[in-house]
Curated annotation (Swiss-Prot):
The lineage of its organism: Bacteria, Bacillati, Actinomycetota, Actinomycetes, Micrococcales. PROSITE patterns: AA_TRNA_LIGASE_II_ALA. Coiled coil: none annotated. This is Alanine--tRNA ligase. Consists of three domains; the N-terminal catalytic domain, the editing domain and the C-terminal C-Ala domain. The editing domain removes incorrectly charged amino acids, while the C-Ala domain, along with tRNA(Ala), serves as a bridge to cooperatively bring together the editing and aminoacylation centers thus stimulating deacylation of misacylated tRNAs. It comes from Kocuria rhizophila (strain ATCC 9341 / DSM 348 / NBRC 103217 / DC2201).
Amino acid sequence: MLSHEITQRWLSYFEARDHHVVPSASLVSQQPGAMFTIAGMVPFIPYFLGQETPPYQRATSVQKCIRTLDIDEVGKTARHGTFFQMAGNFSFGDYFKSQAIPMAWELLTTAPEQGGFGLDPERLWVTVYEGDQESYDLWHDTVGLPAQRIQRMGRDENYWDTGQPGPAGPDSEIFYDRGPRYGKDGGPAVDDDRYIEIWNLVFMQYQRGEGNGKDYEILGELPRKNIDTGLGVERLAMLLQGVENFYETDQVRPVLDAAAKLSGRTYHGAEKAGEQGYDDDVRMRVVADHVRSSLMLIADGVTPGNEGRGYILRRLLRRAVRAMRLLGVTEPCLPVLLPESRDAMKGVYPVVAEDFERISRIAYAEERAFLKTIESGTTRLEHAVEVAKGEQRALSGADAFALHDTFGFPIDLTLEMAEEAGVSVDETAFRALMAEQRQRAQEDARAKKGALADLSELRRMLDDHGSEFTGYTELVTPTTVRAILSGGVSVPAASEGEHVEVVLERTPFYAEAGGQAADVGTIDSSDGAQLTVEDVQQPVKGLSVHKVTVSAGQVLVGDEVTARVDSRRRHDGEAAHSGTHVIHAALHDVLGPDAVQRGSFNKEGYLRFDFSHGEALNAGQIQEIEQIANTAIRDDFEVVTREMPLAEAKKLGAMSLFGEKYGDEVRVVEMNGPWSRELCGGTHVGSTSQLGSLSLVSEQSVGSGNRRVEALVGLNSFNHLAAERTLVNQLTGMLKVQSSAELPERLAATLDKLKETERQLAGLRQQQLQAQAGQLARDAERVGPVTAVLHDAGEIASADALRSLALDLRTRLGSEPAVAAVTGVANDRPLVVVAVNDAARDAGLAAGQLVRTAATTLGGGGGGKPDVAQGGGSDAAKIPDALAAIRRQIQSTAG
């Protein structure tokens, strides 16, 4: 039975039993703090935790999942893969164990011609929680499973919880016995290679308390009991297709076979080290798994990058390419492998075929970039490994960091290649350097917003009274104070000077969302209370929390108040938000539909827009985008908003934000019909002419494959243009030209003169250094048996000038042991170059060691070949100390 038949059979079975079929959610998780969807129940977490009310009581899905925690084990076992599909059936307060268990048994054991999977019931085993007698009785008495094939397990094995106070409950797992050749008899408790888990049924029936691990108190039963089950599609396919592991199933095997053909190697199916072809088989399995995972991630909008999801995708693609190189394939391989994965997956996920042009372009570009990285980085890594071997030490964290930071060489590849060469890597030092880099970046990041109330308190409020948003149609709303929170705790009142959070029954204030900044304004009561609204957030969907300062009087829960939005700020913010839609449409006109939105932020007069694009925009493209945007403003397109079902909006081609979660009903914002049609819950101007003007002020990279533009609208745009006009007038006067049209030619001529002057100055400095070489060689000092020149050249033109001086000095010092160590400062950075001759090397002196000693003193690092090396630092005042450190090392090594 093919994989697409398995998934269709699953959905049909549960749909016939009144389950709502829910399409797979994106691999990009909507849960805070999670990068990927890692289980079938993840999209339903808000329902299980009571954060949202489910629109149905029964549901079923086949969910795409990604897990990369055990990425290093991929290919080595039959169980580890990064992409997998989890089929699940779910009940939200409807049926429970007495229906879930018989349905699972029926679907697994019913003959295929009758709609089931046809597994041999004599080969099925189950485990239950040792305290769950109800499940045991259902399996034994209702289903008829013999007692010897029902095993009771402890809390560690058969009890589910979220890891924190909340829902919990026992689970029951179903296993398939693959037979005695896979391991010993005795059931799942004895051997998990022979008895493979295929389905887990979780019974959420209790409320757990505080505690670590599985050591917590059960507080009582939940008022609504839920069912969450998950069946591994790949594992079931493995059994139904009679293959040894999931790599050999119909959705994965074609890539494995293509890798074997491309490399000229034979796939043996070896699963243990030492078996024939094991190493090659592992590499082919890595390729098959990672290519499929990459295909699915790119299809869901992920692009390669250096952080987060992008880094995971980049690592998967590069590990696949690296594995092919170890199989002897040095040319690009993804153009052969990726289409195989597409063809294997399109039966279940048609989007991989429909969007393959974009998917392949991203994947192939990443492979080309990685091959260049390998070419440049491998040479440097091999040299660093050679030096480390010669000095009988690990590859330093600094070397690994330099490869990663400067050349884009991933640390996992450094670890693999170093291990192959028999050298370890100081990974602790590397991680420390990475942490320092992240810390520096975080110091510049915006401070986090103040903490809001505990989520459980907010959910209680949502159940009691949500917040009706009136701000689409009005900016002033009579309303009632429903709650006041101080430090996350409900309080009955707040007085002048206090900073609190307020929940209103109805509110015109827009809560920050979708890239749009929150409204600000005031809340007043007839009793004289005045509240200044500084921020509005929705920590729980449907409940707006206003962060306020009580400016005067006292506000009480239950007070009748008037909420007023700052109309000027709102209008200017709406203009910026509408501007992001205009920019998005203009980008599509110029760059094509692949310029997909990756994020945005807008506030009064300013907008920032991130989009997918592989290269910097040129001046002509920027000008064209700006012109299209301002033409749309001139043409005064009406901004139309409509609410409709999500399916209808998608049929109309409405664009959605990558990674955003939408309900069944959505709001669509249009400008000039299909020219700009987006799903959007934000507020907007009535027509594009209300933007006034739009000026693009910057364009930059925000990670591999993504760009960012910033723009000003309205009065901010006019002020920007006025400032540029003033600057042009100033330059016209300074450069003594008649009009601004002459500026480019005059500036080019001035810069040419400056470059020529700098070239002449650099030449003079180089001549001066060379003229000094003879005298420096004659004044050389003796450090033990070594003739040494330890000289600070002061201000220099470049590191090349310093290197030339060191090599010249080494030649002049003759054939006796000699060291030339020279320092200088270029562009405010201290540099050091050391050159040693063969006799000095025979005496145990290495240029790289001497440079590292000096560079460490200067607050930096360096390296190079044993005969010549260079480095640098950050503290030029330490140059005398650096030269003294070299002198001491020469004395201690050769003296």
